[in-house]
Swiss-Prot record:
Residue ranges of every copy of the ACT domain listed in the record: 552-624
UniProt GO cellular component terms: chloroplast; chloroplast stroma; nucleus
TM region(s), chain numbering: none
Record-linked PANTHER family: D-3-PHOSPHOGLYCERATE DEHYDROGENASE 2, CHLOROPLASTIC, FORMATE DEHYDROGENASE 1
Source species: Arabidopsis thaliana
Keywords: Amino-acid biosynthesis, Chloroplast, NAD, Oxidoreductase, Phosphoprotein, Plastid, Serine biosynthesis, Transit peptide
Protein name from the UniProt record: D-3-phosphoglycerate dehydrogenase 2, chloroplastic
Modified residues (Phosphoserine): S71
Knockout consequences: No visible phenotype.
Length: 624
């Protein structure tokens, strides 16, 4: 009897504001994008403090150096060659030293675009600040070698995220270490602008004494609109409240309870800009926010408003701001960031008497520089070792407590996807996949993004010749025309657990194992988590109960005595260790499915002997 054999391995995609892509935050954690085969035989993945354990061993080769998920060791293998890490801009010494403990570090500054392309082809990781442009051409030049880009800071507009995603490269940033520094600089600009500090300083140094010219405005009782209530915006609001200001904010993604806790009202964009005396910008630069402060926006503002920007230069139309300053709509502006950096010395905006400028100093404190260096070094080193990254910007992110709870279900989801596609004749003709989550929880209480990502990864890996991980699995799936739909069914079980079961169906394809075909005619498998371990609980219409570990042999057979013994003897004679067996049947003494878990991969002769058992109608060998 012929037998079928497939194999597979272990990750999906995405970043906040008026666009639907949320920005990174330390409040979120992301499943690791990859494990490095060159540096790790296997790794235990931790979800914050909880362990994410998987069971796949990986093969160490120079050409296929990055793994997916593996698990018998907590550490990368120090006897193997170290990863090569390219740093193209000045990084704090503490961060560089940390990187040197883990890899071979090449600090090459002021590289030309061509030199950068040559360097990345020999690098496993790249760390940049805001000056290096990591373009699509850079990722193409890397030829799949580059596995993580670290942005030492918050903004990632100098990194082509789409290209990174397509090439399976994780992008991480360092959003927390410079939060206080940026907020303090915003407040410093606000206060110095209100009291004309920079202009008065220049006046005195020019030999003048113009007290009456530089009468300022008080901050107490004034309204500050914080445009973007993320980490920096929150800290600015906190400090402004301490100065006696009334603070309002606009941010479509900010939790209302967090704003209320600080005494901040969340309002609409137009309400914020039309009622504020001071407007402080803290949103990311996205297609939706590019030049969002323009002639139309300024026309809606209160006459005499004062503007502060320590976020990204591109959110302001600089020519429109000059017109607003000349018209007196904007009384003053204090800017730390610009559309082009450094700006032209002839810029009308820079030379305007009512504008205070600094050369992108938001994160420029000794403490912040060291903190950013350490944060990005830890993120990059951790990503190369396969650890969780709380600051990934192009992979699915969920709250840490949610990830901790979902950990065993994430492993289950990937394995179900992997099994399902192996049962679909090696993926031939696979186009439509349906995923059904059964849960006792309300729809809003179940975040399935990571589960979907892992199922997608499990399905795509065996049928793609591309490097596939959680970062690019959805992209590759779309390229292949795969349609993945999700359904949720409320069941009467304990809401203590997020998911009762996950069912993966591959629609309208032939199966190399007829026993996996449901009554509806689709390949269908279902699994649950039992005592923290993923279990396969249903194949087609047959109920089974097997732990998803090692490898799996599925046999469709006549339901008769002695079958377990016959197959067990064949495997035992070939020194193949059986770690579990389970038999499921629909009608007594009719048909049954036997699921056999084995530690080793049986050779072809052993599998042929199993297929030769007269009562076995078909079987398939599957790698988990």
């Amino acid at each position: 009897m012929a037998f079928s054999s497939s194999c597979s391995s272990v990750k999906a995609v995405n970043s906040r504001w008026t666009s639907p892509s949320p920005s990174p935050s330390s409040r979120f954690a992301v499943l690791p994008a990859f494990l490095h085969r060159r540096y790790a035989t296997s790794v235990k993945l931790t979800a914050i403090s909880a362990a994410l354990k998987t069971v796949e061993q990986t093969t160490l080769t120079e050409d296929n150096r990055f793994s997916t998920v593996g698990s018998d060791s907590d550490e990368y293998n120090p006897t193997l060659p170290k990863p090569r890490i390219l740093v193209t801009e000045k990084l704090g010494e503490a961060g560089v030293n940390l990187l040197r403990e883990f890899g071979d570090v090449d600090c090459s500054y002021d590289l030309s675009p061509e030199d950068l392309k040559k360097k990345v082809a020999e690098s496993d990781a790249l760390i940049v600040r805001s000056g290096t442009k990591v373009t699509r051409e850079v990722f193409e030049a890397a030829k799949g070698r580059l596995k993580v880009v670290g942005r030492a800071g918050v903004g990632i507009d100098n990194v082509d995220l789409q290209a990174a995603t397509e090439h399976g490269c994780l992008v991480v940033n360092a959003p927390t270490a410079n939060t206080v520094a940026a907020a303090e600089h915003g407040i410093a600009l606000l206060a110095s602008m209100a009291r004309n500090v920079a202009q008065a300083d220049a006046s005195i140094k020019a030999g003048k004494w113009e007290r009456s010219k530089y009468v300022g405005v008080s901050l107490v009782g004034k309204t500050l609109a914080v445009m973007g209530f993320g980490k920096v915006g929150t800290e600015v609001a906190r400090r402004a409240k301490g100065l006696g200001m009334t603070v309002i904010s606009h941010d479509p993604y900010a939790p209302a309870d967090r704003a209320r806790a600080l005494g901040v009202d969340l309002v609409s964009f137009d309400q914020a800009i039309s009622t504020a005396d001071f407007v402080s910008l803290h949103m990311p630069l996205t297609p939706a926010t590019k030049k969002v402060f323009n002639d139309e926006t300024f026309s809606k503002m209160k006459k005499g408003v004062r503007l502060i920007n320590v976020a990204r230069g591109g959110v302001i139309d600089e020519d429109a701001l000059v017109r607003a300053l000349d018209a007196g709509i904007v009384a003053q502006a204090a800017l730390d960031v610009f559309c082009e950096e450094p700006p032209s010395k002839d810029s009308r905006l820079i030379q305007h008497e009512n504008v205070t400028v600094t050369p992108h100093l938001g994160a420029s404190t000794k403490e912040a520089q060291e903190g950013v260096a350490i944060e990005i070094a830890e993120a990059v080193a951790g990503a190369l070792k396969g650890e969780l990254s709380a600051t990934a910007v192009n992979a699915p992110m969920v709250a840490p407590e949610v990830l901790s709870e979902l950990t065993p279900y994430i492993v289950l989801a990937e394995k179900l996807g992997r099994l399902a596609v192996q049962l679909a004749s090696g993926g031939k003709g696979v186009q439509s996949i349906r995923v059904v989550y059964r849960s006792a929880r309300d729809r809003d209480d179940l975040d399935t993004r990571l589960l979907r990502a892992m199922i997608t990864k499990g399905i795509i890996e065996p049928i793609s010749d591309s490097y596939v991980n959680l970062v690019n699995a959805d992209f590759i799936a779309k390229q292949k025309g795969l349609r993945i739909s999700e359904e949720r069914m409320v069941v009467d079980s304990s809401p203590e657990y997020p998911v009762d079961s996950i069912q993966v169906q591959i629609l309208n394809v032939e199966s190399n194992f007829a026993g996996a075909v449901s009554d509806a005619g689709d390949i269908s498998i279902e699994g649950k988590v039992k005592y923290g371990v993923p279990h396969l609980t249903c194949v087609g219409s047959f109920g089974v109960d097997v732990s998803l570990e090692g490898n799996l042999i599925l046999c469709r057979q006549v339901d008769q005595p002695g079958m377990i013994g016959q197959v067990g003897n064949i495997l035992g004679e070939q020194n193949v260790n059986v770690n579990f067996m389970s038999v499921g049947r629909t009608v007594l003494r009719k048909q049954a499915i036997m699921a056999i878990g084995v530690d080793e991969e049986p050779d072809n002769k052993t599998l042929e002997r199993i297929g030769g058992v007269s009562a076995i109608e078909e079987f398939v060998f599957l790698k988990l």
